[in-house]
Amino acid sequence: MGTSLLCWVVLGFLGTDHTGAGVSQSPRYKVTKRGQDVTLRCDPISSHATLYWYQQALGQGPEFLTYFNYEAQPDKSGLPSDRFSAERPEGSISTLTIQRTEQRDSAMYRCASSL
């Protein structure tokens, strides 16, 4: 199971960057000062029920943050602190918000979707 999940995640990331269709994220890049709030948006493939958020620090592999099945958030165990929150209110577009950003929040944030 671990190998197939890893392959799926890699394909999910390829889909966000290298194809013109599929999952889209905005803003593409965000630079902020410490202490400011940041909200990232993910628009998954329209027929996909499940949406995942990952954090990838420089030189590290992706770390799971949370996922949604439609608007339900069954697992948010990966969200690093109470400053991180995610929502998907209508089962489509999702947002990831980081409040009062800190230096250690510096990373690439990715979303992926699946059936």
Swiss-Prot record:
GO CC term, one of those recorded: plasma membrane
Keyword Signal: yes
Domain called Ig-like: residue spans: 22-115
Principal cellular location given in the protein's record: membrane
Cellular compartment(s): Cell membrane
Pfam family, one: V-set
Signal sequence extent: 1-21
Lineage top rank: taxon: Eukaryota
Residue ranges of coiled coil: none
Disulfide feature: 42-111
InterPro entries: Ig-like_dom, Ig-like_dom_sf, Ig-like_fold, Ig_V-set, TCR_beta_variable
UniProt KW keywords: Adaptive immunity, Cell membrane, Disulfide bond, Immunity, Immunoglobulin domain, Membrane, Receptor, Signal, T cell receptor
One of the GO BP terms on file: adaptive immune response
SUPFAM superfamilies hit by this protein: Immunoglobulin (SSF48726)
Described purpose of this protein according to its UniProt entry: V region of the variable domain of T cell receptor (TR) beta chain that participates in the antigen recognition. Alpha-beta T cell receptors are antigen specific receptors which are essential to the immune response and are present on the cell surface of T lymphocytes. Recognize peptide-major histocompatibility (MH) (pMH) complexes that are displayed by antigen presenting cells (APC), a prerequisite for efficient T cell adaptive immunity against pathogens.
Assembly: Alpha-beta TR is a heterodimer composed of an alpha and beta chain; disulfide-linked. The alpha-beta TR is associated with the transmembrane signaling CD3 coreceptor proteins to form the TR-CD3 (TcR or TCR). The assembly of alpha-beta TR heterodimers with CD3 occurs in the endoplasmic reticulum where a single alpha-beta TR heterodimer associates with one CD3D-CD3E heterodimer, one CD3G-CD3E heterodimer and one CD247 homodimer forming a stable octameric structure. CD3D-CD3E and CD3G-CD3E heterodimers preferentially associate with TR alpha and TR beta chains, respectively.
Name of this chain's protein: T cell receptor beta variable 7-7
Organism of derivation: Homo sapiens
Gene that specifies this protein: TRBV7-7
